[in-house]
């Protein structure tokens, strides 16, 4: 019988010898790369690597794409950060755009600047940062309100303080005189909503306590009577309100107390108002009626109605 030929035993090339072989191959590759370069080329490459420097470059203003992005409501990135009360993000944006007045004073579809929104969302620290960065406090929204108008309407004393303290004197006097599209000054709005502390502050800063509404001539004192607010009446009198100032129809604040429930207001104003401004003036309608009566006379044969019918029968007068 034939026997199968024995196969030669195969020895696995594993272990230390295999690792040495791989290292030797890698060394050969590195050596071959170095050997292919001349000494002058190698020195030049090292020199160039040593001369490489990374220098930060300032990105030119206006090239930031996030400044150009607007929502369908016309809100910029800064508007949105303020609306969502992301204070850290808002402060960082303000820091980056400081001095960029076009971006800081950009108005959305409701003509609101970031400063308007900071007041609306009751964030006085953001309002202060915006003013410091260059935001204009005199810009108006679609209702003609400056940021100070909104702060007075909302009764936020902190925002009022920031806006009045951060404004220069000419700016402040201009804002205090400004009326919105309803004819109201900041003092009028504070009076209408009964914020006595803000009223006192505005008057101390130079607001005209006797400023009249353009539409009908009411002063803050007239408004206080209309609202039946005796505490506001007392404060305005203390601040120098003129009790004898009349509206464009000729009514003094005291005359507006007739038919109103507060006797306290009537007593306060009655002691100070001129006597001829205490009685209600005769209306034009009554005068015209009296005038017509004088000239309208009928004889016995000329009655104003001669065709009266009752139950189908004509009445004989």
Curated annotation (Swiss-Prot):
A GO term for molecular function: transcription regulator inhibitor activity
Effect upon mutating residue 31 to A: Loss of phosphorylation
Keywords for the protein's UniProt record, in alphabetical order: ANK repeat, Cytoplasm, Disease variant, Ectodermal dysplasia, Host-virus interaction, Hydroxylation, Isopeptide bond, Nucleus, Phosphoprotein, Repeat, Ubl conjugation
Residues annotated with Phosphoserine modification: 32, 36, 283, 288, 293
Subcellular location, principal: cytoplasm
Ranges occupied by ANK repeats: 73-103, 110-139, 143-172, 182-211, 216-245
Highest taxon in the source lineage: Eukaryota
Record-listed cross-link Glycyl lysine isopeptide (Lys-Gly) (interchain with G-Cter in SUMO), residues: 21
Effect of residue 36 to T: Decrease in phosphorylation and degradation
InterPro entries: Ankyrin_rpt, Ankyrin_rpt-contain_sf, NF-kappa-B_inhibitor
Subcellular locations according to the entry: Cytoplasm; Nucleus
Residues carrying Phosphothreonine: 291, 299
Posttranslational mods: Phosphorylated at Ser-32 and Ser-36 by IKKA/CHUK and IKKB/IKBKB; disables inhibition of NF-kappa-B DNA-binding activity. Phosphorylation at positions 32 and 36 is prerequisite to recognition by the SCF(FBXW11) and SCF(BTRC) complexes, leading to polyubiquitination and subsequent degradation. Phosphorylated at Ser-32 in response to FK506 treatment: phosphorylation is independent of IKKA/CHUK and IKKB/IKBKB and promotes NFKBIA degradation, followed by NF-kappa-B activation. Phosphorylated at Tyr-42: its effect is however unclear.
Motif stretch (Nuclear export signal): 45-54
Record GO cellular component, one term: plasma membrane
PTM sites of type Phosphotyrosine: 42
Function: Inhibits the activity of dimeric NF-kappa-B/REL complexes by trapping REL (RELA/p65 and NFKB1/p50) dimers in the cytoplasm by masking their nuclear localization signals. On cellular stimulation by immune and pro-inflammatory responses, becomes phosphorylated promoting ubiquitination and degradation, enabling the dimeric RELA to translocate to the nucleus and activate transcription.
Family, similarity comment: Belongs to the NF-kappa-B inhibitor family.
Associated disorder: Ectodermal dysplasia and immunodeficiency 2: A form of ectoderma dysplasia, a heterogeneous group of disorders due to abnormal development of two or more ectodermal structures. This form of ectodermal dysplasia is associated with decreased production of pro-inflammatory cytokines and certain interferons, rendering patients susceptible to infection. EDAID2 inheritance is autosomal dominant.
Protein name in UniProt: NF-kappa-B inhibitor alpha
Gene name linked to the record: NFKBIA
């Amino acid at each position: 019988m034939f026997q199968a030929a024995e196969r030669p035993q195969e020895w696995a090339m594993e272990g230390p010898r295999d690792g040495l072989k791989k290292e030797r191959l890698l060394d050969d590759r590195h050596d071959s790369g170095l050997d292919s370069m001349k000494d002058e080329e190698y020195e030049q490459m090292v020199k160039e690597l040593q001369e490489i420097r990374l220098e930060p470059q300032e990105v030119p203003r206006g090239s930031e794409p996030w400044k150009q992005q607007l929502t369908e409501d016309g809100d910029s990135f800064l508007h949105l950060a303020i609306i969502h009360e992301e204070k850290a993000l808002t402060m960082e944006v303000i820091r980056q755009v400081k001095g960029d007045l076009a971006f800081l004073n950009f108005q959305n579809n409701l003509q609101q600047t970031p400063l308007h929104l900071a007041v609306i969302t009751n964030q006085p620290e953001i309002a202060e940062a915006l003013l410091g960065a260059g935001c204009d406090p005199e810009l108006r929204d679609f209702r003609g309100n400056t940021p100070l108008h909104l702060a007075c309407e909302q009764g936020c004393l902190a925002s009022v303080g920031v806006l009045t303290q951060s404004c220069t004197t000419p700016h402040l006097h201009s804002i205090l005189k400004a009326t919105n599209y309803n004819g109201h000054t900041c003092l009028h709005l504070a009076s209408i909503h009964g914020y006595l502390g803000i009223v006192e502050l505005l008057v101390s800063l130079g607001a005209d306590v006797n400023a009249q509404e353009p539409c009908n001539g009411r002063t803050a004192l007239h408004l206080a009577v209309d609202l039946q607010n005796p505490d506001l009446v007392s404060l305005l009198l203390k601040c120098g309100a003129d009790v004898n100032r009349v509206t464009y129809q000729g009514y003094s604040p005291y005359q507006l107390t007739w038919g109103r429930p507060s006797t306290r207001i009537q007593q306060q104003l009655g002691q100070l108002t001129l006597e001829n401004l205490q009685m209600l003036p005769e209306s034009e309608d009554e005068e015209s009626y009296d005038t017509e009566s004088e000239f309208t006379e009928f004889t016995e044969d000329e009655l104003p109605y001669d065709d009266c019918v009752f139950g189908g029968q004509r009445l004989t007068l």
